[in-house]
Each structure stands twice: as structure tokens, then as C-alpha cells.
Amino acid sequence: LSMGGYGAMIHGLNHPERFAAIGAFSAAIGTEDEQEKNKLQDGPFDPYGLIRKNVAEGKKIPPVYFSCGMQDMLWEKVCHYEKFMEENGVDVTWVPVDGFRHEWRFWNLQIEKFLEWIARTDAYAADQKQHRSV
């Protein structure tokens, strides 16, 4: 959620082999210009550079569940990053939701949706219908 959504992307992209999926809700990810301005470009905290690096190295990026309320203050930046992910071949499930801002009401709903979306790998997985729809 918010800065944690940014953190989820950073951890998932720095260690893609450790994660089955990445969930980011209203992720506080700046634009590429902001990354450069803040001296983050192409470093371990640059979500754009990490995607480019993983693609260049042939690493499989985990599927990403990426959502944002359409009235969120981060909407434009989130849309920009979602487009960047798609352009770079990331398996992204994009969930824009009208009527929500940067708020817990949205995150509570989206966390539940994410848990329904993510592939189960535990002992009970065989008993559950597997699906990845939203």
C-alpha cells in the first residue's frame, strides 16, 4: 500500500526468484524523471531500472497485481508505471477502480481481491479452484 506498494515492487524486482507474485496497491512510484532527479536511476531502488535489468538478464519477473483508485493522488504516476511494465513484457494484472482515493477502504477491498488472484501453493491448493481473474 502506497510506500509499501513501492517497497513490494522493489523487493520483488530485486529478488524475482524468491516471489510467486507481487501485489502493489496505490504504489508510490515516481516517474523516470523523478528517479533520475533523486539519484535513484538504475540503482537498487529504481523500479524502472530494475525491470530493464531483469529483462536484459533474462530473469522472469513474477506476475504483478497492480491497482489504484482512479481519484488517487498517485493515479497518473501509477498509470505511467503500469504502461511501462506492459511495454517491457511484465505479466501485469491492472486493476483501476473508479470512486476511490488514497484510502484504506480501497486497500482493504484490493487486498482481498489480490488474495483471490494469487496462485495458491500451500497444502490446501489442490482442494481449491485455481483462478487468476479479478
Protein language model features and the residues they cover:
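Non-catalytic cap/lid and distal C-terminal segments of serine-dependent acyl enzymes
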Residues: 1-134
